[in-house]
């Protein structure tokens, strides 16, 4: 078992994210995992992730607040415990259009070369 306390989770910089704090809960710099890593993103009001293709298969789960996820031009509003699965390469952006922070659980598969 590998425990990561939120207070000790490594922070990292997510490229093209603005007004978003990110921490790694499992995997990568938080400790080895075999197939995926898990992170938590805190989107402040107005926080965004610019449009970018997903590098690997990805799952988002909103733990608190509301986020607008745009995938290939179609907007979807996600609220408490809503989730979305993105295949590798799907073009997505994320925006917090509310006046309160939103928490997003992020799970991303490791590249196939790392899993093998």
From Swiss-Prot:
Family annotation (SUPFAM superfamilies): RmlC-like cupins (SSF51182)
Functional description taken from the UniProt entry: Beta-D-galactopyranosidase that specifically recognizes the beta-glycosidic bonds formed with beta-D-galactopyranose (beta-D-Gal) or N-acetylgalactosamine (beta-D-GalNAc). May target the galactoside linkages in the exopolysaccharide component of the mycobacterial extracellular polymeric substance (EPS) and help dispersal of Mtb bacteria from a deteriorating biofilm.
Keywords annotated in UniProt: Cell wall, Glycosidase, Hydrolase, Secreted
One GO cellular component, as annotated: extracellular region
Family matches, as Pfam families: Cupin_2
Enzyme class label: hydrolase
Induction: Expression is probably maintained throughout planktonic growth at a certain basal level, down-regulated during biofilm growth and promptly up-regulated when dispersal from the biofilm is imminent.
Compartment(s) where it occurs, according to its Swiss-Prot or TrEMBL record: Secreted, Cell wall
Cupin type-2 domain ranges (all copies): 40-107
Top-level lineage group: Bacteria
GO molecular function: hydrolase activity, acting on glycosyl bonds
Regulation: Beta-galactosidase activity is activated by Mg(2+) and significantly inhibited by Ca(2+), Cd(2+), Fe(2+), Ni(2+), Cu(2+) and Zn(2+). Inhibited by EDTA.
Activity across pH: Optimum pH is 8.0 with pNP-beta-D-Gal as substrate.
KO phenotype (gene knockout): The knock-down strain shows significantly lower biofilm dispersion compared to the wild type.
Enzymatic reactions: Hydrolysis of terminal non-reducing beta-D-galactose residues in beta-D-galactosides
Name of the protein: Beta-D-galactosidase Rv1717
EC number: 3.2.1.23
Other facts noted in the record for this chain: Expression in M.smegmatis, which lacks an ortholog of the protein, changes its colony morphology, cell wall permeability and sensitivity to the cell wall perturbing agent SDS. It also reduces the ability to form biofilms and pellicles, and to autoagglutinate.
Temperature dependence: Optimum temperature is 40 degrees Celsius with pNP-beta-D-Gal as substrate.
